[in-house]
Amino acid sequence: PGKASIGNPAAGSMPHLLAGRLAMLGGFQITNVPFAGSGPAIPQVMGGQLAGMSSPLGDWVQHHKSGKIRILATSGPDRAVFTPDVATFREQGFGELMVREWFGFFAPAGISEAVRQNLNTALRQAMGQQDVRDFVTPLAANLEASTSAEHTRRLAEDSEMAKRLVAALGFKADS
């Protein structure tokens, strides 16, 4: 009941927008508290100064597994392999809040097709190496390669979703 202070890693970030939309859909009010990344907010959540946090899963997995915090939901289409005990928003009746976190590699416009293909090949090879996989596992990241076309499509889809969330929330960036 009332307002709860919910942290996010940056004003206007997808976690910020998702928390705002969850509050709208759930019929409750929150005060969004933006941070410079998730790190500074973690002790405040663990200490009870913040009611919660909307941020990337990898920031919280170790604290969830240790019992210091409880992850309430994940935003992916399926339960995360790192937290199979945590239901998705979709499973909890908030299917609209389905977002996959991803990281992409970008290059300057106008690079040659040969350079683009070489970069793509090198990235795919690196992602297949065990030491790279071992490095990202503690970050709760799944390595998944995509083509440039798939990446472009995902970027467009996510941009459209962000536009809808911004409009629904009436979010205005500080100028």
Residue ranges and their predicted role:
Residues P1-P40, F89-E91, W102-F135:
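Hinge/capping helix and adjacent helix->loop/strand transition within the periplasmic-binding protein
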Residues G2-A4, G26-F28, M46-S55, K68-R70, ...:
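Alpha-to-beta junction loops
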Residues A19, Q44-M46, H64-G67:
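Hydrophobic residues within well-ordered alpha-helices
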Residues M24-F28, E113-S175:
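An extracytoplasmic/periplasmic, membrane-proximal ligand-sensing/linker region
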Residues V33-P43, P56-D59, A149:
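Short helix-initiation/N-cap motifs at beta->coil->alpha
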Residues F35, S54-P56, T74, V99, ...:
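Short beta-strand and adjacent tight-turn residues that come in two discontinuous sequence segments
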Residues W60-M127, E160:
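C-terminal lobe and pocket-closing loops
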